């Protein structure tokens, strides 16, 4: 299964995976508007991969089949307060 990956010019570390390069027909218009003009990053063969950097391969495959796209967002930033409190308790 091949997919095309695009990065968002508006949101750092946000990527959109779609089934076919330049075919955004299954991506909601609202998502595309908030994502910005997609910037092509790469084509990726998902069948040849067991892992991805920050996304679960099976979740990506299922999302592509069921809804035609997968949106990868960055993990939430760690709370500096929680980190500080954790260090002071140790």
From Swiss-Prot:
Pfam families noted in UniProt: YcgL
Domain annotation YcgL: ranges: 1-85
Transmembrane segments: none
Lineage top rank: taxon: Bacteria
HAMAP family: UPF0745 (MF_01866)
Designated name of the protein: YcgL domain-containing protein YPO2080/y2231/YP_1923
Taxonomic source organism: Yersinia pestis
